Each structure stands twice: as C-alpha cells, then as structure tokens.
C-alpha cells in the first residue's frame, strides 16, 4: 500500500521563509539570497517526506506568497497595470500581493480572500477583456528538476483549471468562455513539458468540486478534462480534492481518464457512501484522505482502519492526507515546554507523515504493536469534565440570547451618551508593534523584566498612542493592544482550558504566520483579561476608548479545536467567558466594546444547504449571548474581514451588534450593494483603505471611497475606518494614512453633500 500527502508546509519549522521575505522587502538581501533560503526549505521538505516513507513526495507546493497567485503568474493572468510597472517576475508577484508604490507608480494589491473554509488566504485572479493566457510553468518544472537532481522523484502539484475559473474575478461582463480554450491549451503544454522531463505523476488540485455545483459547472468540469486528458501521454494524472465530498459529480468523475482520484474522508461526509454506492474503478488509484490535514490531534488508527474497511474490496488504495499539511504546524520537535504526555496527543505535519506510514503498515502488515500503542492513547481520559459549566450551558434559555431594548430603540440612548459627529472616525484596534514593544514583551515573558516595569512601559505606550490619535483627530480611540501578541493567543493564555506551543506556526497569508492555541479542555475565565488596560486608557482621555475583545466564534475558529466535543459546545463555553469580560468592561466605565468576529465565515460549511443547521444556527446566537446583558447605552461593535459576506448579510444583521466594520477596500467596496439590498439595519464601517499593503492612500482616494459609500448608504449609518488592525504596519505608513482618513472625512462632512440614497 503506497503512502502519499497532498502538500507540506513551506514556511520552515522556524519561519525561515517569513524572515527571509521580510529582509527582501526591506532590501537587506538580494533575490539570489532569497532563492537560497527557498531551496533549503524545499530540500528539507523532500527529505522529511522520504525519511517518513512517503512514496510520492510533492514538488511545487512551495510558494513565496500564495499558490493561486503562482498559477496566475504561470498562466500570464497579470492585469495590465502590473505589467506597466516593468518589474521582474518575482517582484510582479509581490506587487499583485502587496501593491506597489514609488515616485512614479501607485498600484493597489489584488483582493485577498479565505481559501475555502480555512484561515489561509489566496490572491484572487483577475480576468478581463485584455487577459491573454500565456503558459510559463518554469517554476513547477524547475522545482521538479531540482528535486530530481537531489535524488527525489516527486509528484508536482498545481491548482486545476476548473478551480482557477471558479475563484477568479471577471471584469466587464467577461466569462470563463473567453479564456477556456487557451486555459486548456496551457495545461496541455504543461503535460507535454512534464512528459519530456520524464515526470511520472502530476497532481491537479480541484477543491472547487466540493462546493455546490450547478449543472453548467458540472458540464464545464467534464468539458475541461475530457479535452485535457486526451493529451497526457505517459504522464499519470491525479485529480486531488479536499475540504469535502463530490456528491454532485462523483459518478461522472470516476468515468474520466484520471489515473488516480483523491477523496477527503475527514470532511467529506458523503465520501464513504459514494464509494459504497457507485464503486471505484479498478484501473485507478484511490488516494484516501484519512489523516486530518487541518487539526493537530493524533489519528485514531482504529477508526481509520474501520473506515478503510467500509470502503469494501478496493485493492488500489493509497493512504493520503485529507488536505495540504500547510494548515498545521511543521513539527512537534521544537516544543520543549510541553510534557511528553501532552505531546503524545499531537501530530503536526512531520508527525502526520509518520501516521500515514503507520496506517499503511498496520493495514498491510497487521502491525499490532503500533495499533495497540495508539489504542492505549485513546483509552485514557485526557481531561476532567467541568460539570458546573456543562449545566450552565444546558440551562441557557432563549432570553439569554436576546438583548433588550431593540437595536433601533437603543440607538437614541447611544447617540446621547457618546455625542459623536456624523461619520465617526476610528481604527479597528491594534496599532503598530515596534521592535521595542516586541522586545519588552519577550523580556517580560522570559523574566528579564519585572511586572511593574513592564506595566509602566505599556502605560507609557498607551498614553503615546492616545495622544497620537487625538492629534490626528480620530473620534473614537483605541488603546493600541501593545500587551497582545495575537488577538486569539492573548485571550487563550488567560482562559482555563487552553494550552500553548512555542513554535507551532501556520501560514495565514504571505509573511503573516499565526500560532493557534490548542483547546485542551473545558473553557472558563478565571479573572478579568482586558479591563486593566481598557480602563487605564479611558482614564487618560475624554474621548471614548473602545474596549477590545475577540469574539467566541473567532477564538475557536483560530484555535485548534477539540475533537471529543462539538464545535457548538466549545463556542458556547467561550461565549460565556467573553460575556463575563464584556460585563466587567462595562462596569469599569467603557462605553464602546468591540467584539471582533473576523473569522465568522471560516467554518461556514462549503455547501449552502448546511449553512444554518450545521453552523449559523449556533454561531450567531453565541455572539448574541456575549453581549445580551449590557445596558442600552453601551455600544457594541464587531469587525469582520477577508471573507465573502454578501450572501450571509441577514445573519450578520441578526448578530444584533450596534456597529459592524468590514474589510472592503480590496474588493472595491462590493459589500455596500449587498448591505443596501438587504436593508441592513446595523451601523457600518466599510474599510476605506487596505492595511495589508504598505502603500499610503491619499486624502483624495479616501474621499472618493467615502463618496462611493454615501451614494448607497445614509450618512447617519456610516462609520469611517481602515480595513483591519494596524499591528503589522509601521508608523511611517500608519500616521499619514490615518491623517488622510481624518482629512477626507472632515472634507466630506464640511461639504454637506446631498447624496442619492
């Protein structure tokens, strides 16, 4: 029985890629030096896979920024405004991802969206009338040859043409038909080139197959591959799917001339039933995704073996991961502070390679010692249940999820209490974390800085931040979040039920890596988490200062959750803990409390029919539970970013927040039309500039954004803010950008323009 994975993390076990890229962006290293780091990371990945017994090591899973963006470059799908910059290929890629600004040019970054239901983000391809497909697969081919030279016969992977078409933005009435023929031709060229190099396999990733499909989309997929697979010659082609099942198209797909088909048996609820009902062709390999590529818990071998048995008499099975391992940390080897007893329960990417091999060995060779060891791990009670918390959740009633008075009724109380101007200006929460701030936090964690000295340092930084905001002229201030390393980890560290790693980093986008905390047991709040800093900040100014919290859904979605209880139960535990914090903030005199739900959409099922019953029916009430007990005059804000929200607008309105800020600038404010169409009741702050790009927007640019918003929404409904928190930016970008934001807002206010609503 062969052993395989879909892809391996590319960031390095110590985030080597992140740090090399940041040096390159600062012009501290050359492209050649950056490429050396990349080559070392690829070699390490292939070695790890081979040493673990993986039969099909993967190439072309490496990317400097994003694999979808790599494909756009390979296909020549580069909008004209980026070509005009006349940059080399790598810098063009970075311009698409980050924007580009110099004395002569000012180009915004392409929109960034969540990769299906993960916390990874992809750069959205843009198709226009000017788009001309021009194949250049040098990256894939070079990395395949690089591996071969190093002694590894790899299976290159690439995102497929169907998924590319589904994910792309189409401008000016253009449809996929405009590029379909050339797109198929480009992949045909890749087949020929890989054949000429002696390539054995090509993995084509088509995760869009697990989404709801129209009849037209099913036919589009079939049309693409009936044509494409005619040209594979000796090359064997694996269709790799993940994040769900193929219930719309399984019967048709197994008829196509693929040599292997990869199915997800972790998130694909119907995958086993599909194989049982319709069978699996004897002339194809079934790449069975049975090792969870998204979570960090050890595989339960008994359950996996039982699942494989349920597939029936299929001889041609390859043990595989359920998705790319880029969604989990690289290895547990660097975790020196967690006990062996705890680490035994975890499998990061390198450990999952071993799991793939062990499952194969147990299945084929009946290795009972490996199986017995795994069974013993799951036979123990890992945590003790909190009975009191369980009872509290059981006895929640409908009233616990409803805030009174209603949204419209309490708005008058808030207007009176806050006395804000039209178009109130604010930020999303965090301010730039300078090397000095990071150094002090690290010194405090290491015991090199006393608590009193560290707190005095933070108070000074908060004062500076408040003074800066007042000088700029913002209406609602924030304390800057200098005490926080991460918007989820910070809270998890103060909640019972969480455990933390040292180096369990996962890529979110580009150079942005996150270290998700792990939900180990039942979650409770032993003491106040943020009141100390929010209350201090409010005492330093007469302007309102927002209390800043992360919401329960986002905390869970950006953690590695338990697998022994439901996501709903874990979320309600978190909601009760955050509710306690909200009430303590209110008691301390904080009048505006922001409860971020940046990741609300992240666990939304990929199929619309499952949205409510499996997610929204408990995720939205969990948010309402958090703020249901606050006073009418306390204003509740929330923030959301980097997802598609247009199709769940009614659910977002049902969160019953008073103000919601959205990421909107990269997506050309497209969410505004949806808000207007759904008669959105909540006050809104669509982000007027993109903070994930280093470029600085002008006052005029922000004014134009505001005018677009006010052409569709009443001025009384609109707040003015950036897209997201400013933590990852520098002061040299933040200060002028916010200054321009306030200047533009004042100009619009002064103009007293009558807008067509």
From Swiss-Prot:
GO molecular function terms attached to this record: 5-methyltetrahydropteroyltriglutamate-homocysteine S-methyltransferase activity; zinc ion binding
The keyword Nuclease belongs to this UniProt entry's keyword annotation: no
Known EC number: 2.1.1.14
Residues given in the record as L-methionine binding sites: 428-430, 481, 596
Binding site for 5-methyltetrahydropteroyltri-L-glutamate: 15-18, 114, 512-513, 558, 602
Binding-site residues for L-homocysteine, renumbered to this chain: 428-430, 481, 596
Pfam families attached to this UniProt entry: Meth_synt_1 (PF08267), Meth_synt_2 (PF01717)
Catalytic residue positions: 692
Record-linked SUPFAM superfamilies: UROD/MetE-like (SSF51726)
Binding site for Zn(2+): 639, 641, 663, 724
Cofactor note: Binds 1 zinc ion per subunit.
Keywords: Amino-acid biosynthesis, Metal-binding, Methionine biosynthesis, Methyltransferase, Repeat, Transferase, Zinc
InterPro entries recorded: Cbl-indep_Met_Synth_N, Cobalamin-indep_Met_synthase, Met_Synth_C/arc, UROD/MetE-like_sf
One annotated GO biological process: methionine biosynthetic process
Reactions performed catalytically: 5-methyltetrahydropteroyltri-L-glutamate + L-homocysteine = tetrahydropteroyltri-L-glutamate + L-methionine
Needed co-factor(s): Zn(2+)
Pathway membership: Amino-acid biosynthesis; L-methionine biosynthesis via de novo pathway; L-methionine from L-homocysteine (MetE route): step 1/1
Top-level EC class as recorded in UniProt: transferase
Function according to Swiss-Prot or TrEMBL: Catalyzes the transfer of a methyl group from 5-methyltetrahydrofolate to homocysteine resulting in methionine formation.
PANTHER family for this protein: 5-METHYLTETRAHYDROPTEROYLTRIGLUTAMATE--HOMOCYSTEINE METHYLTRANSFERASE
Family annotation (HAMAP family): Meth_synth
Family: Belongs to the vitamin-B12 independent methionine synthase family.
Protein's name in the database: 5-methyltetrahydropteroyltriglutamate--homocysteine methyltransferase
Organism in which the protein naturally occurs: Lactococcus lactis subsp. cremoris (strain MG1363)
